[in-house]
Amino acid sequence: MTTPKKTAKTSGNEARELADLSEDIGIRFKYPNSERVYLQGSRDDIRVPLREIRQDDTYTAQGAEANPPIPVYDTSGVYGDPAAHIDLKQGLPHIRTVWLDERGDTEILPKLSSEYGIERAHDPKTAHLRFNQITRPRRAKAGRNVTQLHYARQGIITPEMEFVAIRERLKLDELSQKPEYAKLLKQHAGQSFGANIPTHPDQITPEFVRREIAAGRAIIPANINHPELEPMIIGRNFRVKINGNLGNSAVTSSLTEEVEKMVWSLRWGADTIMDLSTGAHIHETREWIIRNAPVPIGTVPIYQALEKTGGIAEDLTWDLFRDTLIEQAEQGVDYFTIHAGVLLRYVPMTANRLTGIVSRGGSIMAKWCLAHHRENFLYTHFDEICEIMKAYDVSFSLGDGLRPGCIADANDESQFAELHTLGELTDKAWKHDVQVMIEGPGHVPLQRVKENMTEELQHCFEAPFYTLGPLVTDIAPGYDHITSGIGAANIGWYGTAMLCYVTPKEHLGLPDKEDVRTGIITYKLAAHAADLAKGWPGAQLRDNALSKARFEFRWRDQFRLSLDPERAESFHDETLPAEGAKIAHFCSMCGPKFCSMKITQEVRDYADKQKAQRQGMEEKAVEFVKKGAKIYS
């Protein structure tokens, strides 16, 4: 796979860049020795992706022994499918349109509902940046509720629910019946801290998914205006997911680069993407991203609302924010971060903090509350926000605007006061059948991480928790993907459903593509460690396959089975670049004479030989007795 090339960062080049989008920017990639395959659901249009990693044979004295392919969860969309036709200017196939039409509870609007959306659609200055395929938005019919939570509570299993059940199961129910997978599927018992983790893959059914959604313990972020989406689920009783952030700023990054960065994030395994753009052309950037995104897209609408006021928080109004919500909902945003828990009375609680309010959205709303000495309009208009959300099936990501920005401020009065308010708002959203997840910290020392999960489960009624790390120490700028990855693995084990990645540039600057890659791989690792710890069925399959390949010196399979095959191979080749080294029974760490695994294999061979000799002697002894035990015949 080719690393995407850098693009110019000047708006004057945007038209040329967009014209070249589908040409040669590295949007198609090939994973080594693997392919994207599809599992068939109960109907022809439910085709669920996974990736199968093929392995080489193991060669022994007895001959070749086949190693079975290893299925892994895949987020790459069409970009990881060599057979797919990709044209970013056309967008992705609309795989959900038939499902939406069949339900009969939505209508196609004659035009956009948002004043700002209409204005941008007719602005000649942005015509060259506009996505080519303008479609009319879809909205719930009057009096209808179109959320996955509403359907689940009605006892309805939607195609989206069946899709995610198959996707989470990864056909492990089928593989568990095959003898060649018996050893590979062995795993340690997990500790789930009271979660309802399935104990066997065959328990991961569409009905199980429906029950978890109906209980509010899981969400399927799936805006009805995002028909390109390959549905996924976020919940404590499913695989831990990760989110990758992108977005332009007033300082750097272009529209084209954000589209590339989105595809790049999918290549490394992001389950969702948040577009946090704060610079120019936010509306156009988001449209290009959504139309080409097979994963859920989240935003923080207050960022764009603030841009519309020229950056003056005091000038924000409910009407402006409401129009922004509708604008983004009609584009297809799947979840909104809404900082409705930052209440006026909580702001003074942060005065004695070491780092005060560090959330951008939280600080915007705190400033508005203080400037007007009025309650947060996101809180006072929350029911109206719910009405918008349920008309498009946009999920809430209730923002932690008062999250701690350093470990000194962790778990303080203001943080938990806001969390308890988020629980109140969760209950209110559920009365509208709107899906909800809860955002969490932040910066928390390791010994206080579990308390955050306990508080969230208790006060937010087991709604999915979505945390930024947390970072467990503040002494490592440049390495905060590691400081946060430690906290992420732990809180994922305790029950967090989705982890928001942190890159090495955290606190220092806007991440580039390599930072995104490092952040995502770090968080895929943390999420996987959490799945192992909580006992997710089949979580250890990939570990066992890689360990077997390592013991048998199948170097290429080690690379293929790793989270970052390119990096694993490049590190190996730094010291042993010759092609023959990839079949050698040693590495540069110990060399050929001191390799512990090679010595272990020799010990095993010796033991097998001794066993064979003993068995032969025993057989001869039995034969001797049968023949009368005579020394001379």
Curated annotation (Swiss-Prot):
E.C. number(s) listed in UniProt: 4.1.99.17
Residue numbers binding Zn(2+): H443, H507
Protein residues bound to substrate: N245, M274, Y303, H339, S359, R360, G361, D400, G401, L402, R403, E439, Y466
Positions of [4Fe-4S] cluster binding: C587, C590, C595
Superkingdom of origin organism: Bacteria
Cofactor: how and how many bound: Binds 1 [4Fe-4S] cluster per subunit. The cluster is coordinated with 3 cysteines and an exchangeable S-adenosyl-L-methionine.
Gene3D superfamilies: 6.10.250.620, Radical SAM ThiC family, central domain
GO molecular function: 4 iron, 4 sulfur cluster binding; carbon-carbon lyase activity; zinc ion binding
Protein name stated in the entry: Phosphomethylpyrimidine synthase
Species assigned in the record: Neisseria meningitidis serogroup A / serotype 4A (strain DSM 15465 / Z2491)
